[in-house]
């Protein structure tokens, strides 16, 4: 196997990114263990040899994919925080939007989400990337709230609880779907808990 090269030319960078995007998507859709580099090459429209110019193996592609795309799949609410001024008067509305975004992304990326979680349980490096991303997201939300004058005691810990609460609610809707539960009412309860946690 030849030496792994770092692309410099624009065309080479685009080719590597295409392999990364297509390969990661394919492994998320079909399952990591059901895909090989030949499958990825075919899906990306390149030769297998080209793949080995940029990546060691399919795990290398998956790891890079996790680093580049997992936050968008797992934490879509960040886009809303980046583009919205938050204050105590519009917090409830923003929470509604964040939860809806989280649910929709879980539904659209259901297979990818499942595969990422599955791989995080069996691969220490992927698990560590998730842990690091989780802390970065937590820190970003805390800093955003502080910037918008949410001066709450134990804010770091409360934000961690809030992320877990919203994530659990989304999983309930997307994966469990208990017919005996009213999800509109549950959503209201989730928002009420978050509002309570963020009170001065």
For each predicted feature, which ranges?
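Short secondary-structure transition hinges
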Residues: 107-137
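Hydrophobic alpha-helical connector segments
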Residues: 64, 79-108, 149-152, 162
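Hydrophobic/aromatic-rich alpha-helical bundle segments in the mid-to-C-terminal region
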Residues: 114-116, 147-193
